[in-house]
Structures are given as structure tokens and as C-alpha cells.
Curated annotation (Swiss-Prot):
UniProt cross-references to Pfam families, sorted A to Z: PfkB
Gene name in the database record: pfkB
Protein name: ATP-dependent 6-phosphofructokinase isozyme 2
Residues that hold K(+) according to the record: 250, 252, 286, 289, 291, 293
Record entry for activity regulation: Allosterically inhibited by ATP. Allosteric ATP-binding requires the presence of the substrate ATP. Inhibited by monovalent cations with ionic radii larger than Na(+) (e.g. K(+), Cs(+)). The monovalent cations increase the affinity of the allosteric site for ATP. PFK-2 is sensitive to inhibition by fructose 1,6-diphosphate.
């Protein structure tokens, strides 16, 4: 199978806790924190590991929080290729409120990357073998301009590395401007921004996705449609997969789980239909969990079997 790598420029060490209720000024008693790796590409690599595959996570790691992050990934059998960073890896906080069932996500700025640290990450990427898949996901940290990221994607493509970009806004537009991106996964609102018009009907969404494929910007576009599942388009096919009704607990890990599952199928040279089905299954499986947990292998396989009937 084709080897998979992920790139996360702004990784995080995520801590989750529970408190009975939230109110201002007073001390809020919380449960002991649970620590998990965080960051777009890292979570994609974790989802792939949960599903029985393997992806090497490339990222900067700094300070004690960076060491803790690397240790947690080792516990999940996720191979890593890290660059030592001067600034400590950021730490995010997720709080679940028992009384209301609400979740609060406190997201810190990514640790700044200097030019030398980015250059080392670039070297890690350009050592990837031709034909391998690289998933670029997550936000840009301070010190890294969008131009640097697009130059890295272009350089990787010239070496035969197949790039998947899971981003939004200017970063997604800039990546598509390079062209020949293996896969993008915008939601309907993001797709509307990409084609610069409102998309109100299902056929509008399909046509917009096909425009991006036909223009050569991306080989595959999978539009996330929330409860309506996802619409997948390539040069020859168009398919919509609607998930079964499930008791959703949290949507936090759904997107990264979906990208991980689709990447795994892409590495297996599966059809567009199989890829979208497996992605929707993993995304739905992730919503069964509370907090920030990703998809599980068993839940994903059960939903995938249901969708494949």
C-alpha cells in the first residue's frame, strides 16, 4: 500500500476536563484532566491508526508539552518525524459542563516557528518518497506565511508527492490555485466561497464541486454536508453518501476522522464510492463519542457495512 504522511505546523497538547457548572469569578472544580494529541494532521494520523493503517506524523515539538505530545502518540502507535522547536507546543483546553451538556473549547495560538525550524520541516517533507500521500491539515502558526506553505506544496508535488489539503479560507484557495491537489474536503459554505456564489440546491453543490475538478485544481472534491453526509466528485463520478441516524455525542473529531478514513482508502486505490462511504462511516463513528475522541475501528466498520448494503 502507498505510504501516508501528515504535516501539522501548529500541533497541540489537548487537555479535557469536566466541571459540574460554569459561573463567573468563582473557582470551578474540575475532574483530573485527560490529555490527547491535537492538531489537524496529527489527528488524521491517529484516525488512520485507529482504523488499522499507519501514517507518519510530521510536526514541530517544543518543550515539556511537545515531549508529552510525542509520548502520547507513541502510546497510540503513531510513528512521528519531529523537528525540535524553541517555543513550547501549545496546550488547548476542552471543558464539558455536566449541568448543561455544553462543551467549551479554549484554543491557544500555535507556537511560533522560526525560519530554521520551518526549513527543517520542509526537509522532512521533501524526503518523502515519490508516490506517497501527504495530508496537510491544520492552521498556520505565527511566523509562517501562506506563501511558504504553497511553495512547500508545489515543491512536494514536483517530487511526485500526492498532496491532500484539509483547510479553509485563504489557505484552501491558495492550495487549489497550485492545482492537481489529490483531495479537498470543503463544507457547503466553504465551497460557496471557493466558487464565489451561493449554493442553495443540491445540484448547485454538485456543479460547483465538478467545476473545481474540471478546472484541474483538485482531482477529487468531497463536500461535507453535515447530517446529509457527503458528496464526492471526481472526473468521472459523482456520489452522495447519507449516514445512518446515530445518537451523536460530539462532532469535534468527525472531520479529521473522515479525512483519515478517505486517505486510507485512497492509499488502497479504492473507488470514489468506497472512499466517500468509508469517510462518512468514520465521521459518523466519531460523533458517537463524547469530547474530542476520534473514530473507533469497530464503530466505523459497523457503519461502513451498513452503508455498503
Amino acid at each position: 500500500m502507498v505510504r501516508i504522511y501528515t504535516l501539522t505546523l501548529a500541533p497541540s497538547l489537548d487537555s479535557a476536563t469536566i466541571t459540574p457548572q460554569i459561573y463567573p469569578e468563582g473557582k470551578l472544580r474540575c475532574t483530573a484532566p485527560v490529555f490527547e494529541p491535537g492538531g489537524g494532521g496529527i489527528n488524521v494520523a491517529r484516525a488512520i491508526a485507529h482504523l488499522g493503517g499507519s501514517a507518519t506524523a510530521i510536526f514541530p515539538a517544543g518543550g515539556a508539552t511537545g515531549e508529552h505530545l510525542v509520548s502520547l502518540l507513541a502510546d497510540e502507535n503513531v510513528p512521528v518525524a519531529t523537528v525540535e522547536a524553541k517555543d513550547w507546543t501549545r496546550q488547548n483546553l476542552h471543558v464539558h459542563v455536566e449541568a448543561s451538556g455544553e462543551q467549551y473549547r479554549f484554543v491557544m495560538p500555535g507556537a511560533a516557528l522560526n525560519e530554521d525550524e520551518f526549513r527543517q520541516l520542509e526537509e522532512q517533507v521533501l524526503e518523502i518518497e515519490s508516490g506517497a500521500i501527504l495530508v496537510i491539515s491544520g492552521s498556520l502558526p505565527p511566523g509562517v506565511k501562506l506563501e511558504k506553505l504553497t511553495q512547500l506544496i508545489s515543491a512536494a508535488q514536483k517530487q511526485g508527492i500526492r498532496c491532500i489539503v484539509d483547510s479553509s479560507g485563504e489557505a484552501l484557495s491558495a492550495a487549489l490555485a497550485i492545482g492537481n491537489i489529490e483531495l479537498v474536503k470543503p463544507n457547503q459554505k466553504e465551497l460557496s466561497a471557493l466558487v464565489n456564489r451561493e449554493l442553495t440546491q443540491p445540484d448547485d453543490v454538485r456543479k460547483a464541486a465538478q467545476e473545481i475538478v474540471n478546472s484541474g485544481k483538485a482531482k477529487r472534491v468531497v463536500v461535507s454536508l453535515g447530517p446529509q453526509g457527503a458528496l464526492g466528485v471526481d472526473s468521472e463520478n459523482c456520489i452522495q453518501v447519507v449516514p445512518p441516524p446515530v445518537k451523536s455525542q460530539s462532532t469535534v473529531g468527525a472531520g479529521d476522522s473522515m479525512v483519515g478514513a478517505m486517505t486510507l482508502k485512497l492509499a488502497e486505490n479504492a473507488s470514489l464510492e468506497e472512499m466517500v462511504r468509508f469517510g462518512v462511516a468514520a465521521g459518523s463513528a466519531a460523533t458517537l463519542n463524547q469530547g474530542t475522541r476520534l473514530c473507533s475501528h469497530d464503530d466505523t466498520q459497523k457503519i461502513y457495512a451498513y452503508l455498503s448494503r
